[in-house]
Swiss-Prot record:
<keyword id="KW-0408">Iron</keyword>
<comment type="function">
    <text>One of the extrinsic, lumenal subunits of photosystem II (PSII). PSII is a light-driven water plastoquinone oxidoreductase, using light energy to abstract electrons from H(2)O, generating a proton gradient subsequently used for ATP formation. The extrinsic proteins stabilize the structure of photosystem II oxygen-evolving complex (OEC), the ion environment of oxygen evolution and protect the OEC against heat-induced inactivation.</text>
</comment>
<keyword id="KW-0604">Photosystem II</keyword>
<dbReference type="GO" id="GO:0009523">
    <property type="term" value="C:photosystem II"/>
</dbReference>
<dbReference type="GO" id="GO:0005506">
    <property type="term" value="F:iron ion binding"/>
</dbReference>
<protein>
    <recommendedName>
        <fullName>Photosystem II extrinsic protein V</fullName>
    </recommendedName>
</protein>
<feature type="binding site" description="covalent">
    <location>
        <position position="67"/>
    </location>
    <ligand>
        <name>heme c</name>
    </ligand>
</feature>
<keyword id="KW-0602">Photosynthesis</keyword>
<keyword id="KW-0732">Signal</keyword>
<feature type="binding site" description="axial binding residue">
    <location>
        <position position="131"/>
    </location>
    <ligand>
        <name>heme c</name>
    </ligand>
</feature>
<keyword id="KW-0150">Chloroplast</keyword>
<keyword id="KW-0793">Thylakoid</keyword>
<dbReference type="GO" id="GO:0019684">
    <property type="term" value="P:photosynthesis, light reaction"/>
</dbReference>
<dbReference type="InterPro" id="IPR029490">
    <property type="entry name" value="Cytochrom_C550"/>
</dbReference>
<keyword id="KW-0472">Membrane</keyword>
<dbReference type="GO" id="GO:0009055">
    <property type="term" value="F:electron transfer activity"/>
</dbReference>
<dbReference type="Pfam" id="PF14495">
    <property type="entry name" value="Cytochrom_C550"/>
</dbReference>
Length: 164
């Protein structure tokens, strides 16, 4: 039984190393154009570093993907994280600054009602513990991840259950 255990542990270690290398390659492969996203409503842009890209992916997967895997919204399939949905919201959520504000204190799609008690956020960190330790830098990386995904996954990002 012990040799099998060693084989299992070795295989697990190889998978972890492969996953780590794959994530590093993923972030490095993205050119500047892909890593450039809108910073604020004025249209000002910013180019994310490979480290921010990698960090955003990890944090999104840990804190957001349970409900937003692939850019969908499991609780409301009509509103996803695709560019069209983000730009149609009030205020628009198609830039880093506004996405950060939304993650801190989410509102309904029309911006009229707080949904902090229903949607994980910094404001509702007591209810949603995964949000508890996220810093502004973490939120910046998560917002960046959301905004570069349409450039990487194209129509699959926010495309709904036909893809996921």
């Amino acid at each position: 039984m012990i040799p099998n255990r060693k084989i299992q542990l070795s295989l697990f270690a190889v998978i972890i190393v492969f996953e780590t290398l794959l994530n590093q390659v993923y972030a490095m492969e993205l050119d500047e154009a892909t890593r450039t996203v809108t910073l604020e409503e004025s249209g000002k842009t910013i180019t994310l570093t490979p480290e921010q890209v990698k960090r955003g992916k990890r944090l999104f997967n840990n804190s957001c993907a349970q409900c937003h895997n692939g850019g969908i919204t499991k609780t409301n399939p009509n509103i996803g994280l695709d560019p069209e949905s983000l730009s149609g919201a009030t205020p628009v959520r198609d830039n880093i600054r506004n996405l950060i504000e939304y993650i801190k204190d989410p509102t309904s799609y029309d911006g009229a009602t707080s949904i902090a008690e229903l949607h994980p956020s910094i404001k509702s960190a007591e209810i949603f513990p995964k949000m508890r330790n996220l810093t502004d830098e973490d939120l910046f990386a998560i917002a960046g991840h959301i905004l570069i995904q349409p450039k990487i996954a194209a129509e699959k990002w926010g495309g709904g259950k036909i893809y996921y």
